[in-house]
């Protein structure tokens, strides 16, 4: 009797995440996930009632991944500039995920809910030397302005309309 293979939720999530990371949500289906894993669609539907439940799990994983990519970038020592550069770099290195979450809006949220008003971003900025004496409202306004500029650049980079050149992008963001 052949050994049965166990397809876990972790395997399904990781495989689905990699599909979305490479090609976006448009190609995500139980059949494509199963093909990638090398199984039938049955294990996928054993773990998830429907594709919407699976998509919600992928969104959680992807947003945490994208936020980590963006927030871990440090080049200039200026927190706001580094956040902007990290955001544009994320669009360059992860274009399918960037488009899905920040251009196609697969999560149906306002972008201001994700980035400028993010408590994590405000906290990071408040802890930086250059923002110690700035009110929370002024800080949120500065973040929003920088983010709008960075988002425009990142969108152009993600769709291939602007070549990713970090030095030029840094000059624009300054």
Regions found by a protein language model. Name each.
Residues 100, 146-165:
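Amphipathic C-terminal alpha-helical segment
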Residues 56, 60-83, 123-127:
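Amphipathic alpha-helical linker/stalk segments
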Residues 28-35, 44:
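Append "Primarily bacterial transcriptional regulators
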Residues 12-20, 28, 62, 66, ...:
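Short hydrophobic clusters on alpha-helical segments that form packing/core surfaces
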Residues 89, 93-126, 155, 159:
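Short secondary-structure transition hinges
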Residues 1-23, 32, 53-56:
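Basic, helix-initiating cap at the start of DNA-binding domains
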Residues 107-134, 140-144, 171-174:
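Amphipathic alpha-helical packing segments from all-alpha helical-bundle domains
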Residues 22-25, 38, 45-55:
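HTH DNA-binding helix-turn interface
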């Amino acid at each position: 009797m052949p050994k049965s293979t166990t397809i876990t939720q972790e395997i399904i999530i990781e495989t689905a995440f990699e599909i979305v990371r490479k090609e976006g949500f448009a190609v995500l289906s139980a059949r494509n996930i199963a093909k990638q894993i090398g199984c039938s669609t049955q294990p996928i539907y054993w773990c998830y009632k429907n594709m919407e439940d699976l998509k919600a799990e992928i969104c959680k994983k992807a947003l945490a991944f994208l936020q980590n990519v963006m927030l871990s970038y440090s080049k200039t020592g200026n927190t706001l500039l580094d956040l902007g550069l990290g955001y544009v770099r994320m669009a360059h290195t992860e274009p399918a995920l960037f488009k899905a979450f920040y251009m196609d809006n697969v999560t149906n949220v306002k972008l201001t809910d994700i980035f400028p008003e993010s408590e994590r971003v405000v906290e990071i900025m408040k802890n930086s030397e250059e923002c110690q004496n700035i009110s929370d409202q002024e800080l949120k306004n500065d973040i929003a302005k920088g983010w709008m500029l960075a988002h425009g650049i990142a969108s152009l980079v993600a769709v291939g309309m602007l070549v990713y050149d970090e030095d030029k992008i840094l000059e624009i963001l300054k």
